[in-house]
Amino acid sequence: RYKEYDLLHAHYGLSGLLATMQLSIPVVITFHGSDVNMKKNYLFSRIASRLSAANIFVHQRLPEKLKIYRGSVNIIPCGFDNNLFFPIAKEEARKTLKWGENTRYIAFSSAFDNKIKNVQLAWSAISGINNCNLIELKGYGKEKINLILNASDLLLVTSLSETGPIIVKEALACNCPIISTNVGDVQRLIKNVRNCYISSYNPDDIKKKISLVFRGNKRTNGEKVIKNFKLENIAYKVIDVYRDTLKNY
């Protein structure tokens, strides 16, 4: 059914470029990272960013890479759904998942076959740790991932590149300890969170930090730190961009 719209919001550079082909209503584009960082997508995104009425970036480095230094640049990271991700007692979550009480479980940030996630580093880091399982976060619904994050001893991120991994925000919302390479906005997110660590790409360094988490055996205060990234708070910021765009169009 035909409807009239006041504004079009596209996600990713290529979709945004297609959206700007019509000239009747303003276009807002959100750039997520892969559309800027990957060579095959860069040109599409750069052109789209010049044709749009406003641009949203999930990380402050993205407009710099597109060489945008003025105009409508809005840094709004992706949010998480606090109705789906929240703390549950680890013992209760493990009981629901039928996990062993005395086994160590480390949640891996993504699918093992995603090369950018660098799972080989994770395997190297946990080698030699007795009774420890690396859990692949692939093929699960949000409810199950919430249980896994609450049941796991920690979330491990060994990525070669990220912009703003949502799984880190979701883990923080579950008070799950995090060990991560210094990618995207992770360092800023966990800066004031206890029992979370930034690691190098040295497996021995990661192993030492895993030992610190295991030895401390405590959850984090991530739920309190991450509250500003709830979906509704992010939505208000996006709506403000819509209003400013329509006012200035």
What are these regions (language model features)?
Residues 10-15:
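Short His-centered aromatic/hydrophobic patch
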Residues 39-40, 80-96:
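Acidic anion/phosphate-binding donor-loop and adjacent secondary structure
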Residues 49, 147-152:
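Short alpha-helical donor nucleotide-sugar binding micro-motif in glycosyltransferases
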Residues 100-117, 123-129:
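Conserved donor-binding/catalytic core segment of Leloir-type glycosyltransferases
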Residues 160:
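Aromatic "clamp/platform" in nucleotide-sugar-dependent glycosyltransferases that forms part
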Residues 177-180:
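Short hydrophobic beta-strand element within catalytic cores of glycosyltransferases
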Residues 192-203, 211-215:
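Conserved acidic donor-binding segment of nucleotide-sugar-dependent glycosyltransferases
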Residues 201, 215-247:
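A charged, aromatic-enriched C-terminal amphipathic alpha-helix characteristic of glycosyltransferases
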